[in-house]
Amino acid sequence: EQQCTPGQTKKEDCNNCTSGD
């Protein structure tokens, strides 16, 4: 499971992080 940095959101459906725009 990848860690999300501040400002990112967890995409639970694919278990990764994306920019929290």
Swiss-Prot record:
Entry-linked SUPFAM superfamilies: PMP inhibitors
Lineage start: Eukaryota, Metazoa, Ecdysozoa, Arthropoda, Hexapoda
InterPro entries given in the database record: Pacifastin_dom_sf
Protein name: Serine protease inhibitor 1
Origin species: Melanoplus sanguinipes
Keywords: Protease inhibitor, Secreted, Serine protease inhibitor
GO CC terms in record: extracellular region
Region of interest (Disordered), ranges: 1-21
GO molecular function: serine-type endopeptidase inhibitor activity
Source taxon at top rank: Eukaryota
Annotated function: Probable serine protease inhibitor.
Residues covered by the Pacifastin domain: 1-21
Tissue specificity statement from the Swiss-Prot or TrEMBL entry: Expressed in hemolymph.
Family: Belongs to the protease inhibitor I19 family.
Compartments where found: Secreted
